[in-house]
Amino acid sequence: MTLAIVKEVPAGADGDDTTDLVVLSDAAGRMRVRADWVRGNSRRAVAVEEAVAKQDGVRVVHAYPRTGSVVVWYSPRRCDRAAVLEAIGGAKHVAAELIPARAPHSTEIRNTDVLRMVIGGAALALLGVRRYVFARPPLLGPSGRMVATGVTIFTGYPFLRGALRSLRSGKAGTDALVSAATIASLILRENVVALTVLWLLNIGEYLQDLTLRRTRRAISELLRGNQDTAWIRLTDGPEAGTEVQVPIDSVQIGDEVVVHDHVAIPVDGEVVDGEAIVNQSAITGENLPVSVVAGATVHAGSVVVRGRLVVRAQAVGNQTTIGRIITRVEEAQNDRAPIQTVGENFSRRFVPTSFIVSAITLLVTGDVRRAMTMLLIACPCAVGLSTPTAISAAIGNGARRGILIKGGSHLEQAGRVDAIVFDKTGTLTVGRPVVTNIIAMHKDWEPEQVLAYAASSEIHSRHPLAEAVIRSTEERRISIPPHEECEVLVGLGMRTWADGRTLLLGSPSLLESEQVKVSKKASEWVGKLRQQAETPLLLAVDGTLVGLISLRDEVRPEAAEVLTKLRDNGVRRIVMLTGDHPDIAKVVAEELGIDEWRAEVMPEDKLEVVRDLQDEGYVVGMVGDGINDAPALAAADIGIAMGLAGTDVAVETADVALANDDLHRLLDVRDLGGRAVDVIRQNYGMSIAVNAAGLLIGAGGALSPVLAAILHNASSVAVVANSSRLIRYRLE
């Protein structure tokens, strides 16, 4: 057999996309390629895996964002090596929206970790047999020491590598403590002790990693479930109507996806055929199934409990609602909570102190084993795990409830909020108003015309009032005249050009600002309607008032209860803001028991209210759902967007997004944030106590290096186990 090892060879030199690839090795059907642009970029790693997997003869491909390398297993006879390199290079330019929302395959592959544990365990077993079965002396001979040293270096490689990296950066980390103890034991010919310690530490690291991956796996299952394929119904050609099975990642927008009993819906889209009972808990957090018929919108991750649906795909992969959740969760797990700096400061100061204490112990006692023990027990690994494990578990818990938390810092703030600012429409109210009155204010206009032209102004708006007007025309089967152009006047209304006319639709303030006269009769109607908590919209055509439409939005049934519980849980200030008239705002505020409210506010006014509360020393939460809430959502200590499928600007700006519109989720956000901080504090207390106690006991000579390693592992595993309780915290 001939093996060809190619070192540091550029993969291409003709100006193509392979010029920045380096083939590190290529032998016996296994090729390793370095692609620096993959390093630290999990999404791009997925793109590489997807592109290479499509090439003929490729068996398995793993892209490693931690190292920037790509490993391809292929059939030498069937696979074109150049095509594989081309596919890797081409993946660099794949649009982000076309990359499936999943983790790289490499995140689940930890063969080397398992191999280290197996080899280390086997070596220890053989040494035990040698010592106790064959009654050989405990000290190893030259050949035995050489083998034991080799195995020790192999099992301790991750720690040695980490120590070198930390020393290059001028910081002595926890890996440096383990490495120093290992090197000392090898110099003193304590090979068995070193191997035992490293084997135990490797087991602990593997168990920690296994526990931490539960969150990512739980979130990924929301999108893919247990299925890798989907059924689609062909719509073109002679086989139209035939159902065929395809890989789930190949489903495209516009495909008609067929979903049967007990199968997760793989796309966001509109139901075009069939009816079913659907469990939407993955998206909304609600366990009660709902009935779905043709015309309804469904989301990926929802499960058909009973029935059959044909769904026309409107979003696939990471562009679906659940895909956005997964993307945000993965980004959020890199966000650092302020409390994390406590552990980092402790570790940064504690590691050098541990070296000093160990050196003093060696000088005073002359016992190298005791000094080694001090280094091992002083490793603040558990302290370093305290915050990220808890944050990761809590974010995963929230995602499974339909609460998208975009980072650890926001989670910590959620538990400290003591002032909340609410936007009224769509937040405290249902946000689905209905048209209650249509009044013509001009002799040449009929109510139906007023409604039709109002709908023309609102036809492309996603504002709840606009949607109510459109629904009303559809219910009355009134045709809507097309418009040529429209302009959104934020907080006031719309200006539209249709049929050669200029239309203004909005509040009386809009008409006054545009010099349109509002009659006494219209003003009386406006006042009367506002006292009934109805919102009047005035329609002016070419500078003349022609009609009035009023709409009413009901208060959410759970709003009063949630506000009461927020006050009971320590929220001292609750403020309601609305662009509506003061009369309407007053009626809603009185119904909900809100003392502080402001009406007719613009986006900058909402921002001002948030900043004023912050200046008074409050930790401010802002809850909203519209474009006009975005500045305040961004400025608040924690911004919460209602409805993940709502306004994209609000969802992108907010720190937390709720997948459904149930205000009870606000209580869950605060509860989860507070619980996460409690768990982090427990972790810190437990891990720091173990470090301190271990140092005292170790200095007295009561601990061996092996016992120190066991205690070190026990504290780390205890921290991870304590944090993992958050994964299932109050999740029913």
From Swiss-Prot:
The active site is at 423 (4-aspartylphosphate intermediate). It comes from the Bacteria. The chain crosses the membrane at residues 105-123, 146-164, 172-186, 195-209, 342-366, 372-390, 676-695, 705-724. Its EC number is 7.2.2.12. Disruption phenotype: Deletion of the gene leads to growth inhibition in the presence of elevated levels of Zn(2+), but not Mn(2+) or Cu(2+). Deletion mutant shows strongly attenuated intracellular growth during D.discoideum infection. GO terms for biological process: copper ion homeostasis; zinc ion transport. Induction: Induced during infection of D.discoideum and by elevated levels of Zn(2+). Belongs to the cation transport ATPase (P-type) (TC 3.A.3) family. Type IB subfamily. This is Zinc-exporting P-type ATPase. It comes from Mycobacterium marinum (strain ATCC BAA-535 / M).
